[in-house]
Amino acid sequence: MITAYDLFAQNGIKSVSMDDIARSMGISKRTIYEFYTDKEDLLCRGIVYTYNRFKKLLSTYESESETVIEAILGFYHELIKHPKCYNKKFYADLKRYPRAMEIESLYKSEFSETCRRLFDRGVKEGVFLSEINFELVTLIANKHINMLEPSKAFSSH
């Protein structure tokens, strides 16, 4: 599943066939179908796995960081280490898979709630102004993540 999700994230979902996945894993397509009903099932499970991993990571940064800025920068640093998570083609193809879109939406909503918690913490710490339009900042951050091409944006860092 991780191999399949990595291929989807790197090349776009539509571009990756079940044959490509089987070949990459060194197994037969039949073996894949013994565990997964179809490509969307693989995709959905990959999304769940990836978001749970990032959610756990963010939770760790949130609880172990002394300041909210430390938590945000630590997590953001982890995100940019994984450029495959930002392929524009992946997000464009995702629209063709309704169950996967639903899962993605749910996790984005959870992520927004976590961001809100971090923002509130930042206001309490005196790092953020309470007058900031949090919804706009969240919208910009989500769009930034979907449009980002770290290989180009961060090549000098």
Task: Go through the PLM ranges and name each one.
Residues 7-41, 45:
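Helix-turn-helix
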Residues 109-144, 155-156:
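Hydrophobic alpha-helical bundle segments that form small-molecule/ligand-binding pockets
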Residues 80-117, 136:
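Short secondary-structure transition hinges
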Residues 53, 82-86, 118, 122, ...:
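A short secondary-structure junction motif
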Residues 3-7, 78:
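Short amphipathic alpha-helical elements of helix-turn-helix/winged-helix folds
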Residues 10-13, 63, 129:
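Helix-turn-helix/winged-helix DNA-binding modules
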Residues 45, 56-85, 138-141:
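Hydrophobic alpha-helical connector segments
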Residues 1-4, 21, 46-50, 54, ...:
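Generic hydrophobic, amphipathic alpha-helix propensity
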